[in-house]
């Protein structure tokens, strides 16, 4: 049985994954995998370059390129993504299937994705745990973590599916409001999943 963990920005899903790791559970991180695959997959490199342009990757003289790793031009990619929703969907259509395949190949039973439902990767798991937190707590966490304004934090939250919608689709919820006992909630869910 495969389990997906999701939650909006600032909910603390990465911290929950850290607590799972302390219990011996390895969680596949979809965001990290996407970044790794964009650096290492020849097919992704070619398709992204065809879509975005030759500026997609930086031309470096480092040995890493010869070792099969390229440096993504984050500024160029961000500019392309923010230019239109269609651009973002086009990049997703290239990257998401590669991540899906990589997860399947990994043999891992747990995965973490901020966009589990939006990306469709929820189809690869049997049950979903959502990590939630009150919006004010999330805003505060994002502002502190990323040193950004309140307005920017609210904007980032607004780009994702509403927390309530994700909650309704999930099988389990972990409330990470700074008050509820996270360890107890995790242990309760793990006991049910045994």
Say what each PLM segment does:
Residues 1-67, 187, 192-194:
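Glycine-rich phosphate-binding loop of ATP-dependent small-molecule kinases
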Residues 23, 45-49, 135-140, 150, ...:
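An amphipathic alpha-helix signature
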Residues 97-104, 111-145:
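ATP-dependent NMP and nucleoside kinases share a basic, alpha-helical "lid"
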Residues 12, 31, 91, 110, ...:
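Residue-level signal for inorganic ion chemistry
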Residues 8, 51, 80, 94, ...:
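Amphipathic alpha-helical segments that mediate coupling or scaffolding at interfaces
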Residues 22-24, 104-109, 169-171:
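Short glycine/proline-enriched coil/turn segments at helix->beta-strand junctions
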Residues 35-108:
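ATP-dependent small-molecule kinase phosphotransfer cores
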Residues 99-103, 123-124, 144, 148-193:
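Small-molecule kinase domains that catalyze NTP-dependent phosphoryl transfer to phosphate-bearing small molecules
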